[in-house]
Amino acid sequence: MGARKKISAEKRKEALKTMYFAKLQNVPTSPRKMRLVADMIRGMEVNRALGVLKFSSKEAAARVEKLLRSAIANWEQKNERKAESGELFVTKIFVDGGATLKRMRPAPQGRGYRIRKRSNHVTLFVDSKSNNEDQN
C-alpha cells in the first residue's frame, strides 16, 4: 500500500471511531427490495423508525429493525448511557449489492435459464440531533 493511501485509510478509520453505526452483511434479499425499506426510515427519529419497521409488511423490515436496534446499542455502548426518546436519528442508511449466486432453471427444449439470487450489505448510521447540527 502506498504512503498516501495508508494515510487516508488511517484518517477514515479514525473518523469511523466517532460515528455510531451497524452493518448487516450478506443478507439474502435483493438490494432493490431492501432499499424500499431503507428509504422508509432514512432521516427518522429512531423510536418512530422502529414503529414503522415493526408494522411494515415487508420481509426486509424485520432485518432492518434488528440492525437499527444494534446501532442504538452501539451508540449507548460508546456513550455509556441510555438513549432517550427523541434523541437519536437515522442519519444515513445505504444498501450495497453483495455476492450473487447463479443458479440454473430448466427451460424448454433442453435449455437452462440463469437465475440470479442476489444478496446485499446494509450500513446504518445513527447520531443525536446536536451532533448533526455541529457537523453541518
Swiss-Prot record:
Gene Ontology molecular-function annotations: rRNA binding; structural constituent of ribosome
Gene3D superfamilies noted in UniProt: Ribosomal protein L22/L17
Any one biological process term the GO annotation gives: translation
Keyword field: Ribonucleoprotein, Ribosomal protein, RNA-binding, rRNA-binding
InterPro entries the UniProt entry points to: Ribosomal_uL22, Ribosomal_uL22_bac/chlpt-type, Ribosomal_uL22_bac/org-type, Ribosomal_uL22_sf
Domain of life: Bacteria
Binding partners and assembly: Part of the 50S ribosomal subunit.
NCBIfam families: rplV_bact
Functional note: This protein binds specifically to 23S rRNA; its binding is stimulated by other ribosomal proteins, e.g. L4, L17, and L20. It is important during the early stages of 50S assembly. It makes multiple contacts with different domains of the 23S rRNA in the assembled 50S subunit and ribosome.
Similarity comment: Belongs to the universal ribosomal protein uL22 family.
Name of the molecule in the record: Large ribosomal subunit protein uL22
Record organism: Bacteroides fragilis (strain YCH46)
